[in-house]
Amino acid sequence: MKIGFLSRWGATCGVGMHAEILAREFIRMGHEVVVFAPTEESASKEVKYYKRTEAQDPEFVKREIYTEVDNVTEEGWVKEEEILKENLDLLIIETFWRVPVKPLTRLIEKLKIPVISVFHEANIFKAREVVKLPCDKIVVFDRRFYDEILEFYEIPREKVEVISYPVMKPYDAEPERPVSEDKFLFFSFGRQPVEEYCDFLNALKKLRKRFDNVHYWIIRSDGRVDYEAEWITQWQKRPTVEKLYSYLKGSNVHLLPKGNTPNVVVSSTLYQIIASETPIVIRDSRFVETIETDVYGFGPIVKYRNIHDLVHKLELLMLDRELVEDIKKEVRVFVEKYGGDKIAQEFLDLAKTITK
């Protein structure tokens, strides 16, 4: 089977990461994959979310195939011939508010194959145009996307399929850390706003009063956090996923910065790296509300409610090895349930139900 993706690739965003996880699983299963990526100029206009990583493109990625637009003042374009000549059996569109709806609609009308839209949009306002794409099926990561967005636009329920965001397979990477083994190392990475590091800095400074071996390692793509201390190491990089696994395996706890939002969201970062089994601590918010934990916030991840709750839970992770092992067991169950191989098969099964 020859499967095409219309998507970002090699960037720090959940849209491109979803395509990367699925594409690599399809290839492992023996299918051929072609990725049609946007022009660098148009994608990089979304400064907040689009940052290229240090990874090199594989041969199956074709860039400069379409433009990202705002769909209100711009129509954009798609190089139809570049896609049509591939003779695809299935096209998966990673859909969010910047895909060019009008030229894509014209392309879809010419394709005589199943077309699946993976719906990434987070609220009804940004979804206004992209819900018009004439795809055969719309995949959402959980029921919230239908209940809070697609139903608003009267999209038929039978057109919508719930398929979880996939968990990336773990990399067999050697642990790396910037400090000695006697330090208890907390780690954060990404492009989140600096304000979302406040809880972690606050909590760790409190913990330092009891534990002088606490160290915090921060890697950001958009500059340093404006706070310096001898117990903090900061790097400005956009490492590959394989390198991230080295850093995670060298760390004791992963502090994942996510703020509050009213939008319908998932944390693609979490699904990208949870298989490392380094305990993830994250604010209890809409990003993780569908991930089940016990009443205390412990499960495959650790959810915290406020600073005091965060300090208490970080202290437990430092002192209670049995708790850490229990979290790792929960992670393995989560990875088995939502692994990329299983999710990829669900997409193939869905495609088989589409008749052309």
From Swiss-Prot:
Cofactor: record remark: Mg(2+) is required for maximal activity.
Cofactor(s) demanded: Mg(2+)
Pfam families: Glyco_transf_4
Organism superkingdom: Bacteria
EC top class, as a word: transferase
Catalytic activity: bis(myo-inositol) 1,3'-phosphate + GDP-alpha-D-mannose = 2-O-(beta-D-mannosyl)-bis(myo-inositol) 1,3'-phosphate + GDP + H(+); 2-O-(beta-D-mannosyl)-bis(myo-inositol) 1,3'-phosphate + GDP-alpha-D-mannose = 2-O-(beta-D-mannosyl-(1->2)-beta-D-mannosyl)-bis(myo-inositol) 1,3'-phosphate + GDP + H(+); bis(myo-inositol) 1,3'-phosphate + 2 GDP-alpha-D-mannose = 2-O-(beta-D-mannosyl-(1->2)-beta-D-mannosyl)-bis(myo-inositol) 1,3'-phosphate + 2 GDP + 2 H(+)
Temperature optimum or stability note: Optimum temperature is 95 degrees Celsius.
InterPro entries, sorted: Glyco_trans_4-like_N (IPR028098)
Keyword tags: Glycosyltransferase, Magnesium, Transferase
Record-listed E.C. numbers: 2.4.1.361
An annotated Gene Ontology molecular function: glycosyltransferase activity
Record's function text: Catalyzes the transfer of the mannosyl group from GDP-mannose to di-myo-inositol-1,3'-phosphate (DIP), producing mannosyl-di-myo-inositol phosphate (MDIP). Can also use MDIP as an acceptor of a second mannose residue, yielding di-mannosyl-di-myo-inositol phosphate (MMDIP). Minor amounts of the tri-mannosylated form are also formed.
Family, per entry: Belongs to the MDIP synthase family.
Name of protein: GDP-mannose:di-myo-inositol-1,3'-phosphate beta-1,2-mannosyltransferase
Lineage: Bacteria, Thermotogati, Thermotogota, Thermotogae, Thermotogales
Gene designation per UniProt: mds
